[in-house]
């Protein structure tokens, strides 16, 4: 039995060092296509964001344990409440000062969010001193305009719960390549 315990400890140490990396920061990617369609994707530590939205007065560990153990229907209700609050706090202004309508919101599924909370809860019991390394979750939205000049400059307003966020924006260059033909010069 002692031999197996030693192997487990060694394998755990290897796995921990192999997965050690810098903490991923919250970030947003804005992609403008055809001058009229803007896609927004937010990559966030969703369990921490939910904690700040739903119960900032509680310790994170308590919040995680409580929500990880909730019945799925109850958790779904809490999650929808948080999504409404976050969605109302996310805004985008155009260069002319008008607000852009953000539509087609896509949020992480309740089952995946609760699974992430359950994983974090298990880690807090098994290895409380270790930092959680789960993947960030995505929140998506779209904006569109019939006027190509509307999206030349935009300003984002983000909820405080997102913390500091790195924003990457770009307008991809797209070309079609016919079968068997070489592409035109691709510039970077």
List each language-model region with its residue ranges.
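Sec-dependent signal peptide recognition
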Residues: 2-11
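N-terminal signal peptide c-region/cleavage motif recognized by signal peptidases
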Residues: 15-17
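Intrinsically disordered, low-complexity segments enriched in polar/charged small residues
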Residues: 11-12, 26
């Amino acid at each position: 039995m002692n031999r197996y315990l030693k192997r487990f400890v060694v394998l755990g140490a290897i796995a921990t060092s192999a997965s050690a990396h810098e903490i991923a920061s919250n970030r947003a990617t804005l992609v403008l296509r055809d001058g009229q369609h803007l896609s927004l994707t937010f990559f966030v530590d969703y369990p921490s964001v939910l904690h700040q939205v739903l119960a900032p007065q509680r310790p994170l560990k308590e919040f995680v344990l409580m929500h990880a153990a909730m019945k799925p229907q109850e958790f779904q209700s809490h999650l929808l409440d948080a999504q409404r609050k976050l969605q109302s706090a996310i805004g985008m202004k155009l260069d002319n000062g008008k607000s852009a309508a953000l539509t087609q919101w896509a949020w992480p599924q309740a089952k995946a969010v609760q699974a992430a909370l359950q994983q974090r809860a298990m880690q807090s019991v098994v290895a409380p001193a270790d930092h959680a390394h789960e993947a960030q979750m995505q929140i998506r939205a779209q904006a569109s305009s019939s006027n190509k000049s509307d999206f030349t400059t935009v300003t984002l307003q983000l909820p405080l719960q997102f913390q500091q966020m790195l924003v990457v924006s770009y307008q991809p260059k797209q070309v079609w390549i016919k079968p068997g033909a070489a592409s035109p010069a691709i510039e970077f």
